[in-house]
Swiss-Prot record:
The modification Phosphotyrosine is found at Y132, Y133. The modification Phosphothreonine is found at T3, T121, T152. It comes from Mus musculus. Signal peptide: none annotated. It comes from the Eukaryota. Its EC number is 5.4.2.11, 5.4.2.4. It holds the Pfam family His_Phos_1. This is Phosphoglycerate mutase 2. Expressed in the testes (at protein level). It is an enzyme of class 5 (isomerase). InterPro entries: His_Pase_superF_clade-1, His_PPase_superfam, PG/BPGM_mutase_AS, Phosphogly_mut1. Homodimer. Interacts with ENO1. The active site is at H11 (tele-phosphohistidine intermediate), E89 (proton donor/acceptor). Keywords: Glycolysis, Hydrolase, Isomerase, Phosphoprotein.
Length: 253
């Protein structure tokens, strides 16, 4: 018997997504398309008449603004919001700011494929000479982190390792207590939660790429195990395309 509902949404397209650049912890703004995606997702939540008691997001504006849009459109702007670096996107280290073509030219296509598709191989670290080192590592939003907590690069495994404790210690107890939760975050931090909920293998989660801006609904039992497959919210065409895109990701290219 279903006892809980969880809604998650990956932020709308950012300006750096649009330019095909590795974004990671760089605080990119939503693109026009991304802002529209957030509005569409918000409207889908409104149409489904879903209410929230508490929301969680990262400390990066593309996720925060997506959340704001949802709360605005659904007239729930008063709902408490918790922001945490633990829900940030994967830190792409030395690749941050490069587009895929530049990265392939610099490091070789095979190496880039390993960084993108390997579960536990991190990209090269972001050193102090990197263009974005100061704007990320020295930003005051991270002033409270211990030196060992502040990454210079992350694999997907690393990203999940810092996101999951927050899920286990903060979010899961709220859901079990009956709170209706919305998480607006990033492709890789949300992958960590999906992997945990569904007990997916390392390989399977690497092949799952969550669509931007489309709310994902989970019905969970009292042990927070899904009672049904993840469900997308939106008009029929949007949902069909999202489901096809997710299904196709498991197939050989």
């Amino acid at each position: 018997m279903t006892t809980h509902r969880l809604v998650m949404v990956r932020h709308g397209e950012s300006l750096w997504n649009q330019e095909n650049r590795f974004c990671g912890w760089f605080d990119a703004e939503l693109s026009e398309k991304g802002a529209e995606e957030a509005k569409r997702g918000a409207t889908a939540i409104k149409d489904a008449k879903i209410e929230f008691d508490i929301c969680y997001t990262s400390v990066l504006k593309r996720a925060i603004r997506t959340l704001w849009t949802i709360l605005d459109v659904t007239d729930q702007m008063w709902v408490p919001v918790v922001r945490t670096w633990r829900l940030n996107e994967r830190h792409y280290g030395g690749l941050t700011g490069l587009n895929k073509a530049e990265t392939a030219a610099k490091h070789g296509e095979e190496q880039v494929k390993i960084w993108r598709r390997s579960f536990d191989t991190p990209p090269p670290p972001m050193d102090e000479k990197h263009n974005y080192y100061t704007s990320i590592s020295k930003d005051r939003r991270y002033a409270g982190l211990k030196p060992e907590e502040l990454p210079t690069c992350e694999s997907l495994k690393d990203t999940i390792a810092r996101a999951l404790p927050f899920w286990n210690e903060e979010i899961a107890p709220k859901i079990k207590a009956g709170q209706r939760v919305l998480i607006a975050a990033h492709g890789n931090s949300l992958r960590g939660i999906v992997k945990h909920l569904e007990g997916m293998s390392d390989q399977a989660i690497m092949e799952l790429n969550l669509p931007t801006g489309i709310p994902i609904v989970y019905e969970l039992d009292q042990n927070l195990k899904p009672t049904k497959p993840m469900r997308f919210l939106g008009d029929e065409e949007t949902v069909r395309k999202a489901m096809e895109a997710v299904a196709a990701q498991g197939k050989a290219k």
